[in-house]
Amino acid sequence: MNENSLELPSECAIRPASAQDIKSIRKLVWSARLDPTQLRWEQFWVIECEGKLAACGQLRNFAGVQELGSLVVAKDWRDRGLGSYLTKYLIQQATEPLYLECLGKRLASFYTRFGFVEVSVQELPQSLKFKFGLSQLAKTLFKIPVTIMQYQAGCL
């Protein structure tokens, strides 16, 4: 799949998650070593391929903003454009200013391609300062490479 296209492989479909997906979502999120504690299936979109959950991502709602989070592609389905498709799809679904935090320069570069730019904790809306501020504390104390990013509308 071309990064600029919005087409999924023919054997895949995107849909809102259902309560039956939570176990598979948790498994995917856990496999990526992401925090599995803030998973509300109602906020997730999933890509199902050949009857199995191949990717997931969520839009978490905060006061006046949203966070793109928990975006994971199953190992067997990587390098087929599912992460790019889901990122673009979630950007289109967002109804408020959109933020994310990611680990490592590689992920930050990935999100930059979709119009996200790095921002500091001081630039964050109040509703995200505490949550993302904790990540920045971990970055400082434990040298964890956390990047906070904001989507700049019109960059897609």
Task: Cite the ranges covered by each PLM segment.
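A short beta-loop-alpha structural element at the N-terminal edge
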Residues: 12-24
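Helix-loop element at the rim of GNAT/NAT acetyltransferase active sites that forms part
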Residues: 16, 27-38
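A short helix-loop-beta-strand connector motif used in the catalytic cores of GNAT acetyltransferases and
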Residues: 34-50, 67, 142-145
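Conserved beta-strand in the GNAT
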Residues: 46, 52-60, 65-72
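Conserved acetyl-CoA-binding loop-helix of GNAT-fold acetyltransferases
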Residues: 79-92
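Conserved GNAT acetyl-CoA-binding A-motif
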Residues: 92-105
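Conserved active-site alpha-helix within GNAT-family acetyltransferase domains
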Residues: 104-132
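Acidic/histidine-enriched, glycine/proline-rich intrinsically disordered or flexible terminal extensions
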Residues: 132-156
